From Swiss-Prot:
Mg(2+) 2 binds at E72. One of its GO terms (biological process) is DNA recombination. This is Crossover junction endodeoxyribonuclease RuvC. Keywords: Cytoplasm, DNA damage, DNA recombination, DNA repair, DNA-binding, Endonuclease, Hydrolase, Magnesium, Metal-binding, Nuclease. Gene3D superfamilies: Ribonuclease H-like superfamily/Ribonuclease H. Its cofactor is Mg(2+). The gene is ruvC. Binds 2 Mg(2+) ion per subunit. The RuvA-RuvB-RuvC complex processes Holliday junction (HJ) DNA during genetic recombination and DNA repair. Endonuclease that resolves HJ intermediates. Cleaves cruciform DNA by making single-stranded nicks across the HJ at symmetrical positions within the homologous arms, yielding a 5'-phosphate and a 3'-hydroxyl group; requires a central core of homology in the junction. The consensus cleavage sequence is 5'-(A/T)TT(C/G)-3'. Cleavage occurs on the 3'-side of the TT dinucleotide at the point of strand exchange. It comes from the Bacteria.
């Protein structure tokens, strides 16, 4: 069980989505955007940092479960100035999460779309629709918030798949242990995989 915060960074609007994962089940907790209407970049970065800090602290305060964070990686924009601003916004988001001692995983837009839609070149509307289906939402979230939720879903799928893969390979894996060339799991190992 875990809470996952997904972030879609942007210099004018940063989307976030928060889900609860229990095994294969994903449940919506929260989503929204942090708007930075000011023209000055330092003020925008401050708002992103403070907004994500406030949202994350709320969930840290009211949850006993571990919190994971996932952030969309920067794509190469045609305009270098846009790419730089996006990178700065992403840095402010990551700094807010790391300042609260969260581990941050990063995913490309293609990885997120592939995980959520099954197609790495899906458009924003397709991502919104699939987020609604996966989380059983009655109301379609705003695009940036849906992208934040999609990032969280991607992390849930990735971490759950990795745990299953680890469990299967560990149970069936062959190693160089002295006991018939098979790995042996202790109760502690099994508990750590849950």
């Amino acid at each position: 069980m875990a809470i996952i915060i997904g972030i879609d960074p942007g210099s004018r609007m940063t989307g976030y989505g928060i889900i609860h994962q229990k095994g294969d089940t994903l449940r919506y907790l929260d989503a929204g955007t942090i708007r930075t209407d000011t023209k000055e970049m330092p003020e925008r970065l401050k708002r992103i940092f403070q907004g994500l800090t406030r949202i994350t602290q709320y969930h840290l305060k009211y949850s006993d479960e571990p919190i994971h964070a996932a952030v969309e990686q920067v794509f190469m924009a045609e305009n270098p100035d846009s790419a730089l601003k996006l990178g700065q916004a992403r840095g402010a988001a990551i700094a807010a999460l790391v300042a609260l001692d969260l581990e941050v995983s990063e995913y490309t837009a293609r990885q997120i779309k592939q995980s959520v839609c099954g197609y790495g070149a899906a458009d924003k509307v397709q991502v919104q629709e699939m987020v609604c289906r996966i989380l059983k939402l009655d109301v379609t979230p705003q695009q940036d918030a849906a992208d934040g939720l999609a990032c969280a879903i991607c992390h849930a799928h990735s971490s759950h798949s990795m745990n299953k893969l680890l469990m299967n390979s560990t149970l069936r894996g062959r190693g160089t242990s002295k006991k018939k060339g098979r790995w042996r799991l202790t109760e502690e190992d099994l508990a750590s995989l849950k």
